[in-house]
Amino acid sequence: MWIADGWNDYEVIDCSEGEKLERWGDYLLVRPDPQVIWNTPKTHRGWKKMNGHYHRSSKGGGEWEFFDLPEQWSIHYKELTFNLKPFSFKHTGLFPEQAANWDWFGDRIRNAGRPIKVLNLFAYTGGATLAAAAAGASVTHVDASKGMVAWAKENSRSSGLENAPIRWIVDDCVKFVEREIRRGNHYDGIIMDPPSYGRGPKGEIWKIETSIYPFVQLCTKLLSDNPLFFLINSYTTGLAPSVLTYMLSTEVASTHGGTVKSDELGLLVTRTGLVLPCGSSGRWESGK
């Protein structure tokens, strides 16, 4: 398991009865987590003194309840700054477990010894974009949500990366990749964080179990002659790490060599010292 253990401003304090107690900077949040099927005692004071609590509804969705929580605040990871604000379906605008991947591809970029172009697809609020840019890459950031791209730009300014070579694109990721292929553009690194389910601007349906493999095949056409890495993230329990390994092995390593590794991502739980699973990642990297 790849554990994001480099945080100072974030921690999972405890988890029990379908919820996790987290510290985001100076504030405590309680949010639902489907992986938390145990009912260990909730002894930490934060369970009763949280600043925000997302209550899931039996009808689907849910709502936030706030206790002295600002509308927006920020936390830091190494040289990066992220602006947080609770919004729909329990989210805050950041997935802290992804820091394990930021460190991995950041090291690859810094040690490449050449200019690196990175494509970040389904790029959300830009955690991976900023990590790649801070490591020295030129990044193309693509997300279908105008609001998410605006949030990512805000994070870039807060991180002092407003002048970094980042291209911000609001577009359907599949359509964008198809156009980039026609344009003849290529990238040394590709990152994708696809949703389990989604709809495109013209009603196109994205279902990860049936859409991800042809999309990976499509994206390989954008790899440069000397690619550096390819990263796939999945929060869908049906896509085991071994599935990600198989895809990257057949579609990337078969052509470019290198190595493929896939594993769960995790966050340490302070109270127990155990690890909370947070999805999976598949990594291909060149042997160069």
Residue map of PLM features:
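Non-catalytic substrate-recognition/targeting regions of SAM-dependent transferases
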Residues: 5-22, 29-96, 103
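Conserved class I S-adenosyl-L-methionine
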Residues: 114-124
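Conserved SAM-binding loop of SAM-dependent methyltransferases across substrates and taxa
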Residues: 125-137
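Conserved SAM-binding motif I beta-strand of class I
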Residues: 138-143
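S-adenosyl-L-methionine
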Residues: 145-191
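Mobile active-site "lid"/loop adjacent to the S-adenosyl-L-methionine
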Residues: 146-148, 170-174, 187-218
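Short glycine-dipeptide loop
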Residues: 218, 223-230
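C-terminal catalytic and target-recognition region of SAM-dependent MTase-like enzymes
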Residues: 227-288
